[in-house]
Regions:
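Short hydrophobic/aromatic beta-strand or adjacent loop that forms the aromatic wall/cage
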Residues: 13-17, 83-87, 113-116
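Short loop segments at secondary-structure junctions
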Residues: 23-25, 32, 91-96, 121-123
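Short, P/G- and charge-enriched loop/turn segments at secondary-structure junctions
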Residues: 2-8, 102-107
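Conserved Nudix-box catalytic region and its N-terminal flanking loop in Nudix hydrolases
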Residues: 22-62
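Active-site segment of metal-dependent pyrophosphate-handling enzymes
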Residues: 65-105
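Nudix hydrolase/Nudix homology domain
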Residues: 36-37, 100-158
Length: 158
């Protein structure tokens, strides 16, 4: 495989996610993948002809029926296989309501995307919250202040 082909392969496997908040809640997706039900943010693979920003906006539209605009980049995580995962803070108009959309790459009678909903941090499991912190949620207005109000107790299994 040539270097150009390797880079093209890695680029297609890279992902972008959209962090959308409203009134102290985070737009989340309830999904069932690999035998596990969990919550995550809208996002997916970057197509060959798009930027990470364009991918985040496209995934938000496909999966949640929302038209958003990038506010700013939050994080870039590099995976061991060379792929990258980009996260962006995204704003949506106040008059738009999320709907459960689709993932055009997932076909069949039982798609993984089950529901789209607004959730507060205390409604999200610690495991799923860990991914939100990795995506840069603490940089989004209001969420760092919420974390400062939390206690110092250890609440996860030892």
């Amino acid at each position: 495989m040539t270097m150009d082909k390797e880079m093209e392969y890695v680029y297609r496997r890279s992902r972008s996610v959209a962090i959308v908040t409203r009134n102290g809640k985070i737009l989340m997706e309830k999904v069932f993948y690999f035998g596990r039900l969990f919550y995550t943010v809208p996002g997916g693979g970057i197509e060959e002809d798009e930027t990470p920003e364009q991918a985040a906006i496209r995934e938000l539209r496909e999966e949640c029926g929302l038209d958003g605009a990038i506010v700013r980049p939050l994080t870039v995580q590099y995976k061991s296989d060379g792929a990258a995962e980009y996260s962006f803070e995204v704003r949506i108009p106040d008059d738009q309501d999320a709907i459960t959309g689709y993932d055009p790459e997932q076909t069949g009678d039982d798609p993984p995307l089950k529901e789209v909903l607004w959730m507060s941090l205390d409604e999200i499991s610690e495991k799923d919250r860990a991914f939100l912190w990795a995506y840069g949620l603490m940089q989004v207005e209001g969420f760092f202040d919420e974390i400062k109000r939390w206690g110092d107790e250890i609440s996860y299994p030892i």
